[in-house]
């Protein structure tokens, strides 16, 4: 547990300087040029954050890759020597008439022994080459694994630090969802491009160069002829790289937009489901996915055509080379004394070099994707904001006096430059003075507070503190002098203790007693003490485990613990009940003494003791003075106060005594309930826990089954939906795999024909005919490989991209389907869920698309290769197959180890995603608390586990990958050894020499065909081994994906089941409702509540924060089901009703209204039930009813004005009015108002309240309100205390009762 966040330091993350991943972004930004403007960075820029150790690893990896690339074609030199060992063409013209048969038999034995000895020596050379290649492969895999993991962590941290650094103006143009999805997708793609795939690029390039170098050294003119088509191949490679990068960049931009939609909705599921907007958001997400699919399919087509063309040109070059090779052997070429072995070396080395180009598609694709992703990430990292919270520049005064002055301040929001918010504002606040800002919503009050914090800079004029322009002060010092409580308090997903401690100044360590004292001042200590875990209670995401009032009290305690010189209170008590408000208000007034305090409030009773009250109107101060002065003036302020007043006068002392009496009575009842709780609650709680656990297990009962055959499910999913593409791709993959084994048969036959030629003897007609036919066959194979490569790569890639897009759609849709309790669980926090949504489908490419095509191609190549080997020499094939299981075990061990390694890393990245989302979504709160370093360190701590795994897993994974190469090479060497041994064993030595050599050559030809087929099969298995790491990670991602897809929530918003009925009246009834949250089964929230709201009646729920009011509304919306009891709509149990039908009858306005990052009109239209059409005029009418039409129309773009991420571009009151309009456009039978007017100013509240009263006519309305003036006209008021209804009746009945409600009403309003 972190007792004091201010004690953490940035440097505490790294235990080893060798793994330091926290360079100073300022220094890096100065040292490195910014990326180019073409949507991708250069390779040099890609590695811009590499340190000394990283460059050592990069160089080591490149050396290893180059060694592996060079040594593989060099093995062809050994193959050529083997070929020359069997060359008997020089013996064809020898005269054997004078040699006895016994001597010829002796010659047979000598020839066989000589060949066997030579082969054995060459086999040893092959082993040596294999060892060298294996060392190179180990070095490549180890270095690039460690390098990519280190760089991935480093870039993640730099990107997160850059996000924490950016100012509010920048965030106004960027949705938080877009930014947070980048770290899950873009950084992973950068890491992927820096991984072993980058090493494979060097390996293939060096293999290409080495192959041609060997060719030139052995027979330069033959190599030159083969190279005649190289320019065409280079053009193809350039074409491939350019278009792959272009389409990748466009696709990734659309992916970021989709990520923003996902985060906005997943983070606000209550709003989405209450509006029944699951399908609409899913459709919007699907449109972004369709855009991605378009670009990725274009990329797939480019890759398929490009690689097919490369292989066609390669085959064409070999056909041309075969024809010219026959001339060289006959001495008619520029090079002389070229044997068949030399021609084979040239052919095989150039073939291997050219085939390496075919393998370049995957690393080029990964690299181009990484370069495009790096461009987007590095742009953010490079940006140094104008308001830089990390800057050490600026004045740091020795003390802060607290004199604030705004001189002719003009301000416009960056996203609305044509809309003036403040127009020449002049305001001076002296040390220790309390100034209240009042006025209509959107008039500039909260903007003024943001300018004092320097969240923004004014566009004209200046803001000064103690005579210093804020722009001249050190920003961190400035914000450390300020304590802020905002209108929508933000808590972080940690304990209550940590949340309060986050308010402490840098370098200060408040004691436990000081923290508790601040909680008491905020009237929070009592409710915290009643929580099972007390101050160690986790508050959930954005404080979701607490009520609005509880959150606000903790936020107040957080501000008080800072002991600030300046206190900013922006509607600090708006979410508090009357009882708490009075206590907290007194605490705030006490805390304000000696401090400069600025208060923004709509409840004017909270500002009457201010030294000065400033009345704002359209960005200007139209009245200012004390409360009494403004009341005497009888102008705007006077009218506002009158509208909030009641016509009763009370004795405040009596009220205080009554409140004290009720609190003591409540505590006494609680103490008396302890004995009963001890006797019965334990058994009850255990039963409830068991029941809730069983319900959760029922929802997830299919998950274990889904994980068993997840690989098969992905493949079948792909084939079922894209059967035509998959079928054609399957045929293409089988065909492409068959081409090279059959090509090798023709090639060996060609070599045998060439071995029979010599410069001294004219070739026979049959030999020339064979050479011509073989060249034609090779050219036909080239055409075949072009078609089949396009089919298996282009079509499988297209099918794979479609599958990934489809799975993204299904996964997002499944996430929208989950009930609210799913998101209450720690393992399903928004950050984790959005990280999975961004990364898991991308990782699934390891078992789809291109990978499936490559696997089919490989298995086909292996199958045909083994079949051909058995056909030509079954003994050789059988002997080699006997050791093949070793290679199979290594291949699958590689996959298993990669899956094991990726699982904890994935979990760590998901956990870091929670921190990222939490900080970015609440960036203004983070920066106002100067807690950037706290969240940075928290993020760094999340990444410790993958960091530690780097050295643990690097050598193991590299060893297994390198072992794959070694075993493949050993199989080739063993093939030659066993093949020669078998030829030696089965040869008939009692023959004359010439027949013996013919028999020997026939056996050799068959063995050669069998061995080359086996070698191609072994090489294919080796290539399969390089794909296995991605397969392991993809299977893990597939499990996560299908876990969500298979989960059946108990409250299924997609369900078509359930009753519907006509003529809905809207009668709501609670029958003995008991409720516990599934994640907190030990805490009983509602304890047997019963009430009935008849058609057209209004029921008000009042009570202290956390007593269960908002929970009741959530039960009506059926976000949860009651633990016991029933909720009825018109006598129907809502569990039996169709969920969409139920929610379409309800309009809800919440305490903290959520708007989406779209236009005003689109936000209002979100309230329209599915299948209903509304006109713009109806939308305008709803806005007028909510008193929103005038301010919307006054905006430069009117109803088309974008409200920003979570409505950040408009004020709290404006947001709430738009939310009310959104509820009214539904024309609901049941209206749920949870503090619906809490953020409105007095004038707007009166108008909106009248509108709501009018809208409530004919509708059943459930109202939650702390402002009791808003519920005076309710048909029934229920006072909830500790989960039970303590009092009920009309306003007058409860006043006459002179009970708790009466006391609250008198305490709240007092006298005027």
Swiss-Prot record:
It is a multi-pass membrane protein. GO terms for molecular function: ABC-type transporter activity; ATP binding; ATP hydrolysis activity; ATPase-coupled transmembrane transporter activity. GO terms for cellular component: membrane. Coiled coil: none annotated. Residues 404-643, 1068-1307 form the ABC transporter domain. It is found in: Membrane. Its EC number is 7.6.2.2. Residues 59-369, 724-1033 form the ABC transmembrane type-1 domain. Its main location: membrane. GO terms for biological process: transmembrane transport. It catalyses: ATP + H2O + xenobioticSide 1 = ADP + phosphate + xenobioticSide 2. The chain crosses the membrane at residues 51-71, 127-147, 197-217, 224-244, 302-322, 344-364, 725-745, 776-796, 852-872, 874-894, 958-978. It comes from the Eukaryota. Keywords: ATP-binding, Glycoprotein, Membrane, Nucleotide-binding, Repeat, Translocase, Transmembrane, Transmembrane helix, Transport. PROSITE patterns: ABC_TM1F, ABC_TRANSPORTER_1, ABC_TRANSPORTER_2. ATP binds at residues 439-446, 1103-1110. Glycans are attached at residues 98, 819. Belongs to the ABC transporter superfamily. ABCB family. Multidrug resistance exporter (TC 3.A.1.201) subfamily. Energy-dependent efflux pump responsible for decreased drug accumulation in multidrug resistance parasites. This is Multidrug resistance protein 3. It comes from Entamoeba histolytica (strain ATCC 30459 / HM-1:IMSS / ABRM). The lineage of its organism: Eukaryota, Amoebozoa, Evosea, Archamoebae, Mastigamoebida. The gene is MDR3.
